Amino acid sequence: MSESREQEQALTLAVIMQSVQCIREVARTGDTETSRYEPLIEGLLGEYDGSTDALYGAARLAPGLRRVVEQLEDPQEADTTRYVASIFHLERRLMKRQAVLQRIAEGIEQARSQADYFENPAHTSVIRSVGDLYSQTISEMGPRLMIRGEQQHLENERNAALIRALLLCGIRGASLWRDNGGGRMTLLFRRQAIAGAARDLLEALPTEA
C-alpha cells in the first residue's frame, strides 16, 4: 500500500510505542509476546527503502498503532510518555556522534548475520548481541535511561538484554520518524492528524490483526 506522510509518521511512532510497550511488560512481568517484539528486531536489522510498512508490516505493528491512537488522543500513562521522550532524546544525541553511529552500523551487520544463520531474528543470541551493542554504544553516551519494574525481572540477563535491544529498536523508530519529517513540533500541531492516520491504518488491517 502507498502511505501518506501522516501514515508513515504513525507507523514510525508505532515502532516506538510497541518497543516501549514490550519494555514495560518485560520490566513488570518478566515476559512479553514474541509476536510483538520480533517485527521490531526484524525492522532494526532490515534495510529501509522509504516504506515503514514494507520494513515492519503494518499488521505486525497493530499493538503499537493502537497505542499511538491512545497516547495522542488521551495520554494517560506517564511512564509511556517518559520512555518515548527519552528515546527521542537519545536519538537526537546519537545523530551527533558519527563514531557511535558507525559502531552501531557494524554491530547491526553482525546481528543480521546471526539472524540469517539461526533463521530467526528473535533468537536468544541475536537479542543478546543487539542488547550488548546498546550497552557498548548508547549506554556509554550517558546518562542511562532508568527502567521501572520488578527488580527480579530487571536483573535477569535475558530480560536485560531484551530491554536494551528494544530500546535500540525504539531509537530506530525515532530515526525513521525524523526521516519522515517528524520533529518536536509535529506531535504538538499534527497529533490529531497522525492519530487519525493510525486509525485508518488499523481499520485497513485484517480483523485478526
Curated annotation (Swiss-Prot):
PANTHER family (alphabetical): HIGH FREQUENCY LYSOGENIZATION PROTEIN HFLD
Family of this protein: Belongs to the HflD family.
Name of the featured protein: High frequency lysogenization protein HflD homolog
Membrane topology: Peripheral membrane protein
Organism of this sequence: Halorhodospira halophila (strain DSM 244 / SL1) (Ectothiorhodospira halophila (strain DSM 244 / SL1))
Superkingdom of origin: Bacteria
InterPro entries: HflD, HflD-like_sf
Keyword list, A-Z: Cell inner membrane, Cell membrane, Cytoplasm, Membrane
Localization terms from the record: Cytoplasm; Cell inner membrane
GO cellular component term, pick one: cytoplasm
Major localization class: cytoplasm
Pfam family, one: DUF489
